[in-house]
Structures are given as C-alpha cells and as structure tokens.
C-alpha cells in the first residue's frame, strides 16, 4: 500500500535537548494520507538505556518521564536504538517509498537533529523537507491568536499521544486558519 503522497508523522521522547549528550528513549510513528486520515500506527518503542544514562536527565525530564511511566518502560525494555530504528523503517517501507514524505510533527527540527545523530538510516528515509505544525502555531499566535488558543493539547509527553495531537492540531489549522 505504498503511496508517495502519504505522510510520515514521528515523535521522539529524549533525555534532554542536546543530541550530542542526550538520547532517544521513546519513538512512535503514524502514517496518514494527504488528507490527514490515519492509515496505520507504527510501533511504539521504549528504547533501553542504563540507569546511568537516565540519571543524567534534568529535573523536568526526570519528573515528566517518571510520572508518565516512560522511565520504567525504558528500564524494562530490551530494544536497542538500532533495533528501534530497524523496526520503524520496516513499518514505513510498507506505506511510503523512501525519500518521498517530509518528516511531519511538532517542532520536528528537534526530532530530526536527534535522528541525524542517533538514527541516520531513519533520518535518510525522509524527504529533506519538513512539515512542522509548530510553524502554523507560531503564525496563528501572531495573526489569529483566537485560532491558536482554541486548540488545547493534553501534553502527556508520550510519543504516540503527541503525534495524534499534532495531526489533530494540523486539522484544526486547516479548518480554521488556512484559507483555500
């Protein structure tokens, strides 16, 4: 069911914001058609890291990932970074030809930085373009704050939830902000 018009949505949870010193601890993907209808949800993967790595998280990440249960899932996971990358690529190959979909999500440049540093094969699977919902959020904040404020996110900071919210947010901006 590969279609070059399908869109790949991805979200990563990390131990921090610096791809040189922090690591990916969770990833998820969703493939939609060009109209933002979900076609398939990819694997949701907690990536194993040692307690030593997890101990380097700052207070915000320690609290957030601890409260969501992600830290415990990372400790219990048997999946390595390389295995997570391979599983994700295998899923994407069923839906989108390599190099066709932009990387889609919220503040997606940050995810792309981590993929470039830690999962180069997956980063190379995407087209070089980005479809970043946060661009519309920033424009709406300046040009139509009521439109931005009328969309509320749950902010669970779990990868699959974050992707679902990003897709819903783009639908919101398509309906209320983008004029055809």
From Swiss-Prot:
<comment type="function">
    <text>3'-to-5' exoribonuclease specific for small oligoribonucleotides.</text>
</comment>
<protein>
    <recommendedName>
        <fullName>Oligoribonuclease</fullName>
        <ecNumber>3.1.15.-</ecNumber>
    </recommendedName>
</protein>
<dbReference type="GO" id="GO:0003676">
    <property type="term" value="F:nucleic acid binding"/>
</dbReference>
<dbReference type="Pfam" id="PF00929">
    <property type="entry name" value="RNase_T"/>
</dbReference>
<dbReference type="InterPro" id="IPR013520">
    <property type="entry name" value="Exonuclease_RNaseT/DNA_pol3"/>
</dbReference>
<keyword id="KW-0269">Exonuclease</keyword>
<keyword id="KW-0540">Nuclease</keyword>
<dbReference type="InterPro" id="IPR022894">
    <property type="entry name" value="Oligoribonuclease"/>
</dbReference>
<dbReference type="GO" id="GO:0005737">
    <property type="term" value="C:cytoplasm"/>
</dbReference>
<keyword id="KW-0963">Cytoplasm</keyword>
<dbReference type="InterPro" id="IPR036397">
    <property type="entry name" value="RNaseH_sf"/>
</dbReference>
<comment type="similarity">
    <text>Belongs to the oligoribonuclease family.</text>
</comment>
<dbReference type="GO" id="GO:0000175">
    <property type="term" value="F:3'-5'-RNA exonuclease activity"/>
</dbReference>
<dbReference type="GO" id="GO:0006259">
    <property type="term" value="P:DNA metabolic process"/>
</dbReference>
<keyword id="KW-0378">Hydrolase</keyword>
<dbReference type="InterPro" id="IPR012337">
    <property type="entry name" value="RNaseH-like_sf"/>
</dbReference>
<feature type="domain" description="Exonuclease">
    <location>
        <begin position="7"/>
        <end position="170"/>
    </location>
</feature>
<feature type="active site">
    <location>
        <position position="128"/>
    </location>
</feature>
């Amino acid at each position: 069911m590969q279609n070059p018009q399908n869109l790949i949505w991805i979200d990563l949870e990390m131990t921090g914001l610096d791809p040189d010193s922090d690591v990916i601890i969770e990833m998820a993907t969703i493939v939609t058609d060009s109209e933002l209808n979900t076609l398939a949800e990819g694997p949701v993967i907690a990536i194993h890291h040692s307690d030593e790595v997890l101990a380097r998280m700052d207070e915000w990440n320690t609290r957030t990932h601890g409260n969501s249960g992600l830290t415990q899932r990372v400790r219990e996971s048997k999946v390595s970074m390389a295995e997570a990358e391979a599983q994700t690529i295998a899923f994407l190959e069923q839906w989108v030809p390599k190099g066709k979909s932009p990387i889609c999500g919220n503040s997606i440049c940050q995810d792309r930085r981590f993929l470039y540093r830690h999962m180069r094969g997956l980063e190379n699977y995407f087209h070089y373009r980005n479809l970043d919902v946060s661009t519309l959020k920033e424009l709406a904040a300046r040009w139509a704050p009521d439109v931005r404020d009328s969309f509320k996110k749950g902010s669970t900071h779990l990868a699959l939830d974050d992707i679902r919210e990003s897709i819903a947010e783009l639908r919101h901006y398509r309906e209320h902000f983008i004029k055809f």
